[in-house]
């Protein structure tokens, strides 16, 4: 995908299906390829089990093709994009025209929402304390030096 060689840690059948699992589906224009069917099927199983599934850009098309966006709030690169790339898409009434959307255990984003999507995933996984997350997001969304120092002040001391 994207010209990268990816060596997975496990096979799709080895992915634990429980509420602690997290599946990240990166953006690309190859998601309509049938070879991705197994991971999209697993995404559906994970969503039903309460696991977190995160999809950005072209990966949202595969979720739409599988009907996984038909009945819950979501976003993508535009409703027209989903309609064009997924002829059976029926989630128009749930489409939210914003860069990234969190609906319980589903996090979707347009390609322009990558930073917000990352923030929402980090928040869901509780990687940072809330003040660190806020400073991290402020710094990376603005590039302002003051937020870099704010971020550094929230991190634990390495002493």
Locate the predicted segments by residue.
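Active-site-adjacent pocket-lining segments in enzyme domains
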Residues: 4-54, 58-159
